[in-house]
Amino acid sequence: MITKKRSISFLEKQEVEKIIAGIKPEGSRNLRDRALIEVLFSTGMRISEALALTADEMIPLLDEAGTSEFPIIGKGGWQRVIYFSPKAKQAIWAWLELNKDELLFPITPRCAQKMVIKRAKAAGITKRVSPHVFRHSLATDLLKRGVDIAFVSKFLGHRSLNNTMIYSHIVSPQLKEIHKKLYK
């Protein structure tokens, strides 16, 4: 029996960087959008998780040097640790200087989706893009850099390694290279 593999949309790291670079680092919406995209790509959070963050819980995190870890309750009520890159923290800090709301990102998931599509289009990205694509993009980037799929699974908060196997499109070319090196 042949099973159909689920295909996923993802962006190359350079495409994510192109989207971020296309957002001017000034103005309320620009700073919010830049911070949200940096957070989504840096942490691999689901959009619902990112939109639930509060400004107050971010402030202590921003004072730490380098990459910062942060525990969240994700899908299904499971706790996992996420990591904010220095670039994401810098973008959050710039946004917090203007944002006075309790929520870090006081927008709806639909608003976030429209924003991501608009920003990708402005950057010349023609692939299908959604907030969740940044999660797929991070997972793909980690695997391309040689991170073990079991660690990627834990990073994403997957309860089963099978959930992470949708990224096997990345692992397969690497397996071919490993095989070539081992069996010359």
Which sequence ranges carry the predicted segments?
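Conserved catalytic core of the tyrosine transesterase superfamily
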Residues: 1-184
